[in-house]
Amino acid sequence: MVEDEKDQELFTGTKDVVDTHKFDEAKLITWMEANVEGYEGPLTVRQFKGGQSNPTYQLITPYKQYVMRRKPPGKLLPSAHAVDREFRVISALYPLGYPVAKPYSLCEDTDVIGTIFYVMDMLEGGILWDGTLPGMEPSERHAIYEAKVKTFADLHNVDWRAAGLEGLVKKVITLRARYIGGRNNMLLQKLSKFQIWTH
């Protein structure tokens, strides 16, 4: 939770792309022309503020706005920063009418901007900094909490095998189990049971 208004400002909006996250914008434009349906330039690139483990950019054109998520540059752990996994999940949920941004394309060619990335629609929305929703009427809070519960319930009702996510669940659990190791035996036992269920 970000409580201080000054802290909120640090996490809100966009900024110029920081030097360590810059890339060849001309190559990105060429890729978008070939891979993003309906794309028309010119393109302006901004970077979202805040602490994302994967650098996130706002791609602005006169006609539409997009969001790009990429792996950070540098040496990474093999299973870390899996934006390709993000794209796979979003691509599976979007056709079902689940409230995620429309995904356009995943680029696994690191010659384009240096790392794997994907592009999706930019959706406007508010940020609920405090989960207690201060300043709202009880009826407003009720509506938001109810919508949140329904959205999570809808997600849990997705047939993940039919959605093409089979194998992904098992992989994620295996990675988590490996990460936990012997540090939490009770949690590791629960994950082991879950691994059996995903077979």
Predicted regions and their residues:
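Juxta-kinase regulatory segment immediately upstream of eukaryotic protein kinase catalytic domains
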Residues: V2-Y39, L43
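ATP-binding pocket architecture of kinase catalytic cores
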Residues: P42-T198
